A protein has these predicted regions:
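Pyridoxal 5′-phosphate
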Residues: 1-388
Length: 388
């Protein structure tokens, strides 16, 4: 997918390049599916059929019914709809929210806003390896708890949470408590089956993490909680009244194609990415003889994300140095630009490790040459930068 072999893009947790086939499908839909899908004449019916097809493609990757999927503009909007909608719908009988201490800002900040509106918020910090203690979280759930929210895969470390166990434990304590899962970094990276995750009430996904464009996402809402979710917007009937406004058909078509393509070769792609991750880990072990490098991602993290600290060079300095060599990585969440990693701080990482953390995130288009270019850049950078 990359046109320039000298460019090494390793920040796929921030965004992915749009697949040319998906871009082509969007362009075709812009010209072909131009009608308003809510109208009744033939071109509109055909446009509506394109929406239906895409909804089905996405539903098959999540193990849910198509009718339980709602299109949004992005993962952040999906998270806001779920978190605020579920909490506000339950405020007449409860006011407690339990959330992990490493959520994405699009979950963390709406929940803090709910705190300002009278909700009690309890944050559960992870263990040192980034995993949540399910028993510790469940112990905070009581009859007053209206919402529990946890991301499936952490965007900074790749740590994978046991969503099935967590959601089951929550419902065992309070069956009325809603469970929201931010699956933006998990979708099409790990298998998701909402028939097995039967205690998850809402789940968010995003297009630009899976080679579709920015500006499109989706939210799963289990039918059993749909009528108890307060929609923040008022308007037309689109998306069953939850998200009014004429649907962005071309981008929805692109999201559907991304789902179909991503699900088709998930196993092979994961094997390829695991090999890249292993190559990088081996290279970092060798570089650890040159600098006090430590890994922040646990061994069982998803292979797409590897977070480590040099413990000697500021993150921003190293990112700029590597960028000069056309190697692109990050220091953490793109939505917290310039801020120290709240995930690493929640894990109890030392201040130096937080300030020198780097995140590498792969996609199926990355190559061993990308990893070697990064390792060469790290080796040279450690020589040149650690005494600045």
């Amino acid at each position: 997918m990359l046109l320039d072999p000298e460019l090494h893009y390793l920040d796929n947790a921030a965004t992915t390049m749009v697949d040319p086939e998906i871009a082509g499908a969007i362009h075709e839909a812009l010209l072909k599916d131009w009608a308003n899908p809510s109208s009744l004449y033939e071109p509109a019916v055909e446009t509506h059929e394109a929406l239906t097809t895409a909804r089905g493609q996405i539903a098959r990757t999540l193990g849910c019914q198509a009718k339980d999927l709602y299109f949004t503009s992005c993962g952040s909007e999906s998270n806001n709809l779920a978190v605020q909608g579920l909490a506000m719908a339950r405020k007449n009988w409860g006011s407690k929210i339990v959330v992990s201490g490493f959520e994405h800002p699009s979950v963390q900040r709406p929940i803090h806003a709910l705190k300002d509106r009278g909700f009690e918020v309890v944050e559960i910090l992870p263990e040192a390896d980034g995993h949540l203690d399910v028993a510790k979280l469940a112990a905070e759930v009581d009859k007053n708890t209206v919402l529990v929210s946890c991301m499936a895969v952490n965007n900074e470390t790749g740590t994978l949470q046991d969503i099935a166990a967590l959601s089951t434990a929550v419902k065992a304590k309070n069956s009325r408590c809603a469970v929201h899962v931010d699956a933006v970094q998990a979708w099409l990276r790990i298998p998701i089956d909402l028939k097995k995750w039967k205690n998850v009430d809402t789940l968010s996904v995003s297009g630009h993490k899976v080679h579709a464009p920015k500006g499109i996402g989706a939210l799963f809402i289990r039918d059993s909680v749909r009528q108890t979710l307060c929609p923040p917007y008022l308007g037309g009937h689109q998306e069953r009244g939850l998200r009014p406004g004429t649907e962005n058909t071309p981008y929805i078509v692109g999201l559907g194609l991304a789902a179909a393509k991503g699900a088709k070769n998930l196993s092979d792609r994961n094997a390829h990415i695991r090999a890249l991750n292993a190559q990088l880990r081996t290279g970092l072990e060798e570089l650890a003889q040159q600098a006090p490098i430590t890994l922040n991602s646990p061994a069982d993290a998803v292979p797409e994300v590897l977070n480590f600290s040099t413990n000697c060079v500021n993150s921003q300095t190293f990112i700029e140095y590597l960028s000069g060599r056309h190697i692109y990585i990050s220091g953490g969440s793109a939505c917290d630009k310039g801020e120290p990693s709240h995930t690493l701080m929640a894990m109890g990482a030392p201040d130096l490790a937080v300030r020198t953390a780097l995140r590498v995130s792969f996609c199926g288009d990355n190559t061993p040459e990308d990893v070697q270019a990064l390792l060469d850049g790290l080796k040279d950078g450690l020589k040149e930068l650690q005494h600045i």
